[in-house]
Amino acid sequence: MIDDKLRNCFDEMVVYKDLKKSNFFNALSLPSFMRDWILKKFEDEEGNFDADQVAKFVRTYLPKKEDWNSIKNRVVVEQERVKFLAKVSVYIEIKTGEVSFSLPDFGLSFKDTIIEDHVWQECKDDLIGQQETWGMVELGYRAPDDFDWTFEYEKRKTKTKDGKQGKIKLVSFKTFCPYRTDLDYFKDARNEFTIDEWIDILLGAVDYNAEGYGGDEEKKLTMLTRLLPFIEKRLNLVELAPKGTGKSYLYGRVSRYGWLSSGGIMSRAKMFYDQSKHTEGLVAGNDFITLDEVQTISFTDVDEMRAALKGYLESGIYTVGNHEGTADAGMILCGNIRKEIMDADGYSNMFEELPKVFHESALIDRFHGFIKGWNIPRMNDDLKVAGWALNSEYFCSIMHELRNDMSYRAVVDEMIQVPEAADTRDTEAIKRIATAYLKLLFPNVREPGDISVREFKRYCLDRARKMRDTIKYQLGILDVEYQGKDIPNFTINTEYEQ
């Protein structure tokens, strides 16, 4: 039985998830990675847990935004030290060398905080790896220095204090990383499963019940295609889908390495670099950026944003004023789609409802592939996981680590035969998507001989071709220059066909 095999292979990395009836966790509104971490902490070997214990832990260590004033009172007025789980970002002031931090979920900004040097030396390795880091923070208070006074004598000879200000200080920090991600072990464990079993395991890892798909492999694989930007650097995708297919959940609640922006206003400063604050934008600190409900997003300056996006999507480099930066975040455009557009299966103008910034072929050409979200069933109870599954936090950490593994691209480069005069962007798009599929479905592959030609073609190359082909067809609708230009006929290197 696959449950037994899964538990034998992954042991500590498996938790019992039952999203069908776990209204308890739904009420807590926790992201998947946090929920699974708590489950692992409190579940017994049979997957049972004490709801009262969990509720007490959540109340103590997972405060809500409305609890922030109470926390401030305990720290600043009562002079207590308070511990809780939070997302932390650090800032180093160049002029003074002072290090401060922010808690974005609670509105605590850099100007009101301090990380003293001895604390910084202890926890800097955990805090500087990402723009934002989840962990257990311990907060204290550094009172104003009573002896640091300056006096301003006015006509009334009043004096004002202008010395050190009281600040909330970071007393300690323990990163939220409950597992050591042994990539080699994960890769080798894949050898124990068939491709069908592995597809079902991947679905369970991101909270879906494979049996709910009724054995429809295409629906399963289309759902898993959403994970490609999690596992491959700078993979840019467009997905249009009906409402209720779980786009927001998968991109926004499963992994702590991505960012979901749903509606509202997006600026170049927020996305890339803020010149006034001298701070990096979203692309610098995340594995992927998802612009969800993209039809409802407005851009502060369309031309400015389009130029910045074109440069970044092409090379991973962005320039804002005199600042040049590089990043590895992929870009995903998500939107809802009308039934008549779905019925055309990609052969009508699907981009007409996107914001004007995307009404340019040169920009759309930089998106590698298209996900036909109408092939994903609308969310229902049968699709919710109910059984033993890979811990979401562990699996997302594995995908994050696999982004840096270049050996898969080397296999793809060797196995794919590129035809003469092939369009450079088509070639890169197909190779990048095929590499992501290889990492996701066949992480055990270390060289071309480790995968059959049939499986590589079926699960990696052919799927990559189809995803790019939809982009190419849409380009022909947007711009006459692209009409009639099909993607090149990429094949398997004859050395491996034999």
Which residue ranges define each predicted feature?
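Conserved NTP phosphate-binding and transfer environment spanning the P-loop NTPase/kinase superfamily
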Residues: 60, 363-364, 368-498
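Conserved ASCE/P-loop NTPase catalytic core
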Residues: 211-343, 347-349, 365, 488-493
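Extended, charged/polar low-complexity intrinsically disordered regions
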Residues: 1-209
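Long, well-ordered mid-to-C-terminal structural blocks that present hydrophobic/aromatic surfaces
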Residues: 325, 330-334, 350-380
